[in-house]
Amino acid sequence: MIKVENLTKVFHTDEVETHALNGVSLEVQDGEFVAVMGPSGCGKSTLLNILGLLDNPTSGHYSLDGHEVGGLRERERTLFRRGRIGFVFQSFNLIDELNVEENVELPLKALGVPAKERRQRVVEILRQLKMSHRAHHYPQQLSGGQQQRVAIARAVVTKPSLLLA
């Protein structure tokens, strides 16, 4: 599913060159669970941003589901990412103006899933995560743990092949 070879990421600012990733190689098969651990500033978020197609590597190869994706332009990355990759962000990234149900439904709308199917999927995932009773609440009305469950629901409602958290 994921194959990364000699991945590097270099950030340039004025006079400073920062090597966030240097020669990272890994392979993750379908169904495997992998934890990336390390101290602050070691490149974990940079790696996840590249794996999630939010950024490109400076060099190296990255293939996802057999497709070389490491050098895709932003629009191509967005189209490839939709429906294939689910994210649970550290800060949840819920939209304050949308209730729980609407937040979870959002990625399905972006994929063009018909309204009836969207409704069924949202109801089911909220039931599974024991959040049905909060469907019409807004993020600011939820505890941190409840917000995290909504973020998880939104990440998995599209049935992605890759989940990054």
What are these regions (language model features)?
Residues M1-A165:
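ABC family nucleotide-binding domain
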